[in-house]
Amino acid sequence: MRRLLLLRHAKAEPGGPDQDDHDRVLAERGLTDADAMARYLKAQGYQPDRILCSTSMRTRQTVAPVLREVPAPIEFVEALYHAPPGRIAALAQDADNDIKVLLMVGHNPGLEQCAALLAREPVKPKELHRHDLLEEKFPTGALAVLEFDITSWKKLSPCSGKLVDFVRPRDL
């Protein structure tokens, strides 16, 4: 089994006219939400074996409390910056086989589209509720957790994952 955690960066300050989008920082609410999501990861036992994080400032700030709560080796990946869903899935497929739990910290719309691409159709009411929330919106700071009955990340494919959790900062 493999578990993929998709965490969208927390709420960021709007960029100024002379500010590069890559350099935007978290808003006060974003800092609070990032802390809450990090505590949630720990409380749920979502201990990643590896973290892949976009190189943007807001994703770096989002992952900082995560590293305190659930420390793991991290790689900052330029290709995750505003990555489309196919690129996100491809990065997961490239993960080493010894990694059972992979956390990716990035941006929308790519993360939301990737979660929707990989999640199978819900079969139970609880799954249906999670899917409905995911389809409604993948807000800043939200986390989607997908489980795959595969032995290698290379076998990751569309509609093959079970959406076992979807949580937004406001849910905590």
Residue ranges and their predicted role:
Residues 1-2, 99, 140, 160:
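A structure-centric signal for secondary-structure junctions around beta-strands
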Residues 3-7, 100-106:
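Beta-strand elements within well-structured catalytic alpha/beta cores of enzymes
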Residues 2-87, 111, 117-125, 138:
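Active-site-proximal alpha-helix that buttresses catalytic centers in soluble enzyme cores
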Residues 119-164, 169:
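Domain-level recognition of soluble alpha/beta enzyme cores
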Residues 49-67, 74, 147-172:
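Conserved histidine-centered catalytic loops in small-molecule metabolism enzymes
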Residues 105-110, 114, 146:
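A short beta-strand-loop-alpha-helix capping motif that often carries His-Thr
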Residues 44-46, 94-100:
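Glycine-rich phosphate-binding loop signature in dinucleotide/nucleotide-binding domains
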